[in-house]
């Protein structure tokens, strides 16, 4: 960590098709081994399928799905006097987005559908309907924070 001043976060260019920075970030999360064009085609195919299925605008459906997966609280380990407590803390907005994207991609990779575009479309569709693995992960994190609410005074 720098001592003098905080570092400006690197600006991310919006994606070429929709002009959304959020979608560009999602493409980067999905990307493997620097193969961005493949990641873009997977995301765009998935969004096309999602738009046909939901009847909404592709970007709007994507944002609804992302909103349903974003966590508001999480637990962090804090060591106090020889024992470790899981302390619930609020999640920063940038981290909320990052976690939601990561969870959606992880859940899509674990699915058993044919192509990655199909898996991603199905996971985004499930997330938009408040079901699926990514939403379950968010609920588990919230449940863990709720269970450890007694240790909230250890916050830093």
Swiss-Prot record:
PROSITE patterns, from UniProt?
RIBOSOMAL_S7
Spell out the family assignment given in the record's similarity comment: Belongs to the universal ribosomal protein uS7 family.
Superkingdom in the source lineage: Bacteria
| Gene source species | Glaesserella parasuis serovar 5 (strain SH0165)
Which SUPFAM superfamilies does the annotation name? Answer: Ribosomal protein S7 (SSF47973)
Question: Per its database record, what is this protein's job?
Answer: One of the primary rRNA binding proteins, it binds directly to 16S rRNA where it nucleates assembly of the head domain of the 30S subunit. Is located at the subunit interface close to the decoding center, probably blocks exit of the E-site tRNA.
User: Quaternary structure per UniProt?
Assistant: Part of the 30S ribosomal subunit. Contacts proteins S9 and S11.
| Gene3D superfamilies per UniProt | Ribosomal protein S7 domain
- Is tRNA-binding one of the keywords UniProt gives this record? yes
Identification of the protein by name? Small ribosomal subunit protein uS7
Q: Name one GO cellular component term.
A: small ribosomal subunit
Q: Which GO terms describe its biological process?
A: translation
Q: Short name of one Pfam family for this protein?
A: Ribosomal_S7
Give this protein's Gene Ontology molecular function annotations: rRNA binding; structural constituent of ribosome; tRNA binding
Q: Please provide the record's keywords in A-Z order.
A: Ribonucleoprotein, Ribosomal protein, RNA-binding, rRNA-binding, tRNA-binding
